[in-house]
């Protein structure tokens, strides 16, 4: 018989025998994908009644109520959740599977997530998928086909696809330099503080017949009112429970406190009680295991994971250095190109100045020629005047008429000489001015020639630097399989401290995250459509108004002795 197993990011097909057990199929899956943290996961199938059910490891696959088909369909999913992802998840493959499953639950609204948190989570999801933001390759519209936000959040805000993309991209740029695995981890660290994260809900009734929800998670059992799955009203940590059992539809939980009555509720069907029992046993075992020293196998896994992470970090740092070297080389190349362009512009200006100076020199030379001609003309006229004056002095006995005529000629010649003297004076002044301009032009000509020479002899090696340092980043994950077992009687230790006593949300511990969420909330409020508000939105808003969060609520509902809480449950 063929079976198809769908993980969060792959489809696997196997051929099994009639005798193949659930564990044998499970082991084959985890070996194929390289998963060693097997205790969190299980194989899920749809039974003949259409309900999702976890495969029983020690029964034959073919004897279980798997919906018929060829191939038989199974989903490989996380069945149990860690208390703290940062402390417990070891392998990259485990991290990735949890990340994809939680992300899918948030996007499909199985886990309620406020709008501002949804946008911040989306920015980490983009970093996990695409790596660092690059404005050259990540152009507008790049995220148009990515499913990043719950449809509820999109419907509640009057924002275009471009506006959503801009909002997400703004925060995406904040994560520059973050490894993809680190982005997934940051996503989960924020998501695990959501009220519905990791909770399996079951419809139950108390002895009065009141319809309620039972929530089973890594921290214990919680009771919810029918119309509010965000805010538990009564809580029982695993450390207070010593035994669980059921008889038909009646489910019985025996507290460690022997003075307290049994905690009894009723499920609609026996099969529901079986699922509750299995989840309680698994979660309780993991709860107790976390409070014991790590096994040798887990220690080895953690050591290997640290080595792989360090190697990956070193490779990342090497890549960052290479990228930085490349950026420096590109910057120097750009500076060189800018310098060449500036030099070319300077050459053009210098060439223009050179032409202007040469033109001015030509004009000056022409002016000097004209000045010299005027001076020669003046000298000739002065000589002619002197000849006339000499003649006049030598012809004292000349007749009066001739003498008068000569005097008129001398006077006219004197006027001509005076006029020419003035012209020479003007030309002389103009020549001096032109000489000064020529000196300036020659200086510019010298500078232009020097600039031209410098531009044509500047070294051209500034753009070459460390090109050989560029490398590609390869990321691999490997692993083996492990084992787990269950018990109906719980190991107990009354000295175990309730982990929620000191637990704080990441936003409460991290001021930067708190400020980011606050800024996002303010931005989104401007486009919010209050008519699209859901019941969960209203409940969340009221919880925030009253200063409640996941762990504050859990601390509050676990106060008082067990008897008081059992009585409170009976009276709901």
From Swiss-Prot:
A biological-process GO annotation:
neuron differentiation
- Region annotation Disordered: residue ranges? 456-491
Q: Which GO terms describe its molecular function?
A: actin binding
**Where does this protein reside within or beyond the cell?**
Cell junction, Adherens junction; Cell projection, Microvillus; Cell projection, Rhabdomere; Cell membrane
Q: How does it sit in the membrane?
A: Peripheral membrane protein
Question: Which intervals hold domain FERM?
Answer: 1-291
Entry's PANTHER family?
A: MERLIN/MOESIN/EZRIN/RADIXIN
Subunit details: Interacts with cytoskeletal actin.
Name of the protein:
Moesin/ezrin/radixin homolog 1
Q: Which organism is it from?
A: Culex quinquefasciatus
């Amino acid at each position: 018989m063929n079976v198809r197993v769908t993980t969060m990011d792959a489809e696997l097909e196997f051929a099994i025998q009639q005798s193949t057990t659930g564990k044998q199929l499970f082991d084959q899956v985890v070996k194929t994908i390289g998963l060693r943290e097997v205790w969190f996961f299980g194989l899920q199938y749809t039974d003949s009644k259409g309900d999702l059910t976890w495969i029983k490891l020690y029964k034959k696959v073919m004897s279980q109520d798997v919906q018929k088909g060829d191939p038989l369909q199974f989903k490989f999913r996380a069945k149990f959740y860690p208390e703290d992802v940062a402390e417990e998840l070891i392998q990259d493959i485990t991290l990735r599977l949890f990340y994809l499953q939680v992300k899918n639950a948030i996007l499909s609204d199985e886990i309620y997530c406020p709008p501002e948190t949804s946008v911040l989570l989306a920015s980490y999801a983009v970093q996990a998928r695409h790596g660092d933001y690059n404005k050259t390759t990540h152009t507008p519209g790049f995220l148009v086909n990515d499913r990043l936000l719950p449809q509820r959040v999109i419907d509640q805000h009057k924002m275009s696809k471009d506006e959503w993309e801009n909002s997400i991209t703004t925060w995406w740029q904040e994560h520059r330099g973050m490894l993809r695995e680190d982005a997934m981890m940051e996503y989960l660290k924020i998501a695990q503080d959501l009220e519905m994260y990791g909770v399996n809900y079951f419809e139950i009734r108390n002895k009065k017949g009141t319809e309620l929800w039972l929530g089973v998670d890594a921290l214990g059992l919680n009771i919810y009112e029918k119309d509010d799955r965000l805010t538990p009203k009564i809580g029982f940590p695993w450390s207070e429970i010593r035994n669980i059992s059921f008889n038909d539809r009646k489910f019985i939980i025996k507290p460690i406190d022997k003075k307290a009555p049994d905690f009894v509720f009723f499920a609609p069907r026996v099969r529901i009680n079986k699922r509750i029992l299995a989840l309680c046993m698994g979660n309780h075992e993991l709860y107790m295991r976390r409070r014991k020293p790590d096994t040798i196998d887990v220690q080895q896994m953690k050591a290997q994971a640290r080595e792989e992470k360090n190697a990956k970090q070193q490779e990342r740092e090497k890549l960052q250095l290479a990228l930085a070297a490349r950026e420096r080389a590109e910057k120097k190349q750009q500076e060189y190109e800018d310098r060449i362009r500036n030099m070319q512009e300077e050459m053009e200006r210098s060439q223009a100045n050179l032409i202007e100076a040469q033109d001015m020199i030509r004009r000056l030379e022409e002016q000097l020629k004209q000045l010299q001609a005027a001076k020669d003309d003046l000298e000739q006229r002065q000589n002619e005047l002197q000849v006339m004056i000499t003649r006049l002095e030598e012809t004292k006995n000349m007749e009066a008429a001739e003498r008068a005529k000569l005097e008129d000629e001398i006077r006219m010649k004197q006027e001509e000489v005076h006029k020419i003297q003035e012209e020479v004076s003007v030309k002389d002044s103009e020549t001096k001015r032109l000489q000064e301009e020529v000196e300036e032009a020659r200086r510019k000509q010298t500078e232009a020639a020097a600039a031209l020479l410098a531009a044509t002899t500047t070294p051209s090696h500034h753009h070459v630097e460390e090109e050989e340092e560029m490398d590609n980043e390869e990321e691999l994950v490997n692993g083996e399989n492990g084992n787990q077992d269950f018990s109906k009687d719980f190991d107990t230790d009354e000295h175990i401290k309730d982990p929620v006593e000191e637990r704080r949300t990441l936003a409460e511990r991290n001021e930067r995250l708190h400020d980011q969420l606050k800024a996002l909330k303010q931005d989104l409020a401007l486009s919010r459509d209050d008519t699209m508000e859901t019941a969960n939105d209203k409940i969340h808003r009221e919880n925030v108004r009253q200063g409640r969060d996941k762990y504050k609520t859990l601390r509050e509902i676990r106060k008082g002795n067990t008897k008081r809480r059992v009585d409170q449950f009976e009276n709901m």
